[in-house]
């Protein structure tokens, strides 16, 4: 009788350990795929607009910046979608209060930066969240 009780206890303990291990594995990100994508993809366009707007909102510069060149865009699929974007941006002639498409600054006010953005995206709900931003001077 006692041996049977021990076997049952060990069996239940083994099931508990397996369930804990399984639930931990489910919580971890599982990479489905990472691929380089084209800037013309609709969710990429929206994401580029979002990162530009977010950069300009949080920047202490008096002028808006705009994307001059896209260097790389990767889409990472896990339990959600992330874009990893590397771009060159330049300071424009528009102050932050202006929302027009403006020329880039020339001369003394010229400033060019290279930025890496990691963005959480749910395109069909138009949800964007900046996960990481790193910008450095490039001129």
UniProtKB/Swiss-Prot annotation:
Disulfide bonds: 94-102, 115-135
Gene Ontology annotations of biological process type: androgen receptor signaling pathway; defense response to Gram-negative bacterium; killing of cells of another organism
CDD domains: CY (cd00042)
Main location: secreted
One function term, GO molecular function aspect: cysteine-type endopeptidase inhibitor activity
Domain of life: Eukaryota
Pfam family, one: Cystatin
TM ranges: none
Keyword field contains Glycoprotein: yes
Entry's Gene Ontology cellular component terms: cytoplasm; extracellular region; nucleus; sperm flagellum; sperm head
Cellular compartment(s): Secreted
Record SMART domains: CY
Task of the protein: Has antibacterial activity against the Gram-negative bacteria E.coli. May play a role in sperm maturation and fertilization.
Family: Belongs to the cystatin family.
Protein name: Cystatin-11
UniProt source species: Rattus norvegicus (Rat)
């Amino acid at each position: 009788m006692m041996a049977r009780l021990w076997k049952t206890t060990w069996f239940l303990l083994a099931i508990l350990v397996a369930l804990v291990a399984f639930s931990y594995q489910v919580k971890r990100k599982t990479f489905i795929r990472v691929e380089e994508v084209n800037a013309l993809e609709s969710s990429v366009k929206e994401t580029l607009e979002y990162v530009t707007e977010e950069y300009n909102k949080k920047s202490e510069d008096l002028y808006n910046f705009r994307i001059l060149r896209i260097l790389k865009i990767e889409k990472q699929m896990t339990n959600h979608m992330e874009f990893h974007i590397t771009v060159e941006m330049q300071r424009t002639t528009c102050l932050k209060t202006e929302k027009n498409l403006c020329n880039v600054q020339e001369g003394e006010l010229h400033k060019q930066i290279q930025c890496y953005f990691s963005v959480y995206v749910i395109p069909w709900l138009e949800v964007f969240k900046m996960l990481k931003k790193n910008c450095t001077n490039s001129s």
